[in-house]
Amino acid sequence: QQYTGRENIYLYGAVLGFSKKFLDEKLDEIIEFSELGKFIDVPVKNYSSGMKSRLGFSVATLVEPDILILDEVLSVGDAKFRKKSEAKIMSMFDKGVTVLFVSHSLDQVKRLCNKAILLEKGKIISHGSIEEVSKVYEEKTK
């Protein structure tokens, strides 16, 4: 069976430990943030990668967890949604949430992060300030 966006909100929310009642109360907010509107009842198999990312991000950031892991979540989708998502991440920082942000976009890392780790083949090759690590990254990608 192929689940719709709406059904995936409940499935993903359950995996994250949210109750059905809580998700019922937050459903409209999730759909609104995701901007999926008329597509929310379409099977997710028909979603673009950006639409899937919007849905997952909207559920994952519904409440401020202590730690949030975002793996390339902002690498897809349109600029407007990325900007809105970056603002959401910044507001989470302001509330003390730790975000592990995985990205190949140096611009995003510079905008969102205050520390960085550079991995190569699963090994840490640089860590520290954004300035220090970005210099190593830029040298490696020349």
Language model segments and positions:
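Conserved ABC ATPase "signature" C-loop
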Residues: 121-122, 137
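Helical segment within the ABC ATPase nucleotide-binding domain
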Residues: 82-95
